[in-house]
């Protein structure tokens, strides 16, 4: 059966293992994503999500997570990379990095500052900025960030 929708099947959220000094444990990450991607029924992985420390990792570390995941999972494993930034410019930079590093799709998180105030034009502008720099499919993360 051929699937038109690349998001079919199970997509598992992964963690980003950290060392005691708070640096990314690249070997543990490679082992983790490799193991999770090979579980029966898994079609894809979410990397750089909340459990993937996307609030904590630097931009370079987020890019590195995508690179390590891409090198550690089967080519058929769909990688969706989380994008989480307060600034639309930084979110766009993360999107470009993720695409270049081998992500297949992006999950764009809302800026936390929207908890204070946001309107429809802000939401549209932020996501349009990210969409404008990448050819990847984008999933919008819904979170309660205010009214």
Task: Mark where each language-model region is.
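Active-site beta->alpha loop and helix N-cap motifs at the rims of alpha/beta catalytic domains
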Residues: 2-147
